[in-house]
């Protein structure tokens, strides 16, 4: 059984162990293997959704595609840096990113616009993600 630690107003909190300069340091570059993994998934799968782990927008993209009968491959990354090497030009890529037929379709806003206009199903059929 666990014991609760009683609250004591006189007890001081432990000091932070990291130096103040560590917060200003830029994050380390992403591992090259992650970028290659995304690139391979985009080349092999008809529909790939690249997003952050637990992102609600990625969930919406996945549910929309599943509602149309597509089972997208979902790849979770830490940030846009891993995705920049996959897209030609690399600029202006936001997560979640949807790749259809090996090409970048766009984010959630572009996916919704194409879906509302009725162009999404023909694009998915052309990519081989839908058979009906």
UniProtKB/Swiss-Prot annotation:
One Gene Ontology cellular component: cytoplasm
Record-linked SUPFAM superfamilies: Thioredoxin-like (SSF52833)
Keyword Electron transport: no
Gene3D superfamilies: Glutaredoxin (3.40.30.10)
Keywords: 2Fe-2S, Cytoplasm, Iron, Iron-sulfur, Metal-binding, Nucleus, Redox-active center
Motif (Responsive for interaction with TGA factors): 129-132
PROSITE patterns registered for this protein in UniProt: GLUTAREDOXIN_2
One Pfam entry name: Glutaredoxin
Residues engaged in binding [2Fe-2S] cluster: 55
Keyword Transmembrane helix: no
Segments for region (Disordered): 16-38
Signal peptide: none
Subcellular location: Cytoplasm; Nucleus
Record domain Glutaredoxin: where: 35-131
UniProt-recorded Gene Ontology molecular function terms: 2 iron, 2 sulfur cluster binding; metal ion binding
Entry function: May only reduce GSH-thiol disulfides, but not protein disulfides.
UniProt record similarity statement: Belongs to the glutaredoxin family. CC-type subfamily.
Protein name: Monothiol glutaredoxin-S9
Record gene name: GRXS9
